[in-house]
Amino acid sequence: MKAAALSWALMLSGCGVLGGAGLIGSAPPAGQMVPPEQLAPLAAPPPGRALWAELGQDAGPAHPVRAEGPRRFWRMDQGFVFVTEGARVVATAGLPTMLLASAPIGEDPLRRAAPLGPAPLRLSHSLDLAGADGRPEQMRFGQVVQCRLEPEEPAIGGLIERVEICEGAAAFTNRFWFRAADRVLIRSEQWIGRDVPPLRLEVAVEGG
């Protein structure tokens, strides 16, 4: 995974660091205001559709750049770049801390587009992290976290929320929202590195 992480860091070394100026754009009715039935599957967005991304107080559309197998590359107008694999955010660039790579240790159903069952799950991930300038001495490879995806709770407002609690090399909580009618993932809030806010994603509503 080191070679892939180094390639990612070099490829994106020209991305600027998001510095709090705000991501420009008028938001569609995102978040809890969007009825679940209007949202497309987050793990498999329709071709050409943008994601709506929220990072702290900043928000804006993230447009598809390219695809490599199951991975999708996205870029926001202010230069923040991230990669998704299924529902997982697996790499970032353009922030003070970069997630160079995230690899599953064992099975991770959230990296697939298939619906997730209601039972709790134990998951592990290996993370590669670096500073924004990608200097080798700042890189940390093979940082392992152990996670528990909590069992499914009763739906509220047509949504099922699943909470993933992780500890180990880093301690954080991820949240995933599924449409109750078909258990399709439509929204997520994910940790993407130390000292940066979580990244919240959903597929942008057409015409928004």
Predicted feature descriptions by range:
Residues G16-E107, R112-G208:
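Acidic, serine/threonine-rich low-complexity disordered tracts
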Residues M1-S7:
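Bacterial N-terminal signal peptides that target proteins for export
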Residues M11-G14:
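C-terminal motif of bacterial Sec signal peptides marking the signal peptidase cleavage site
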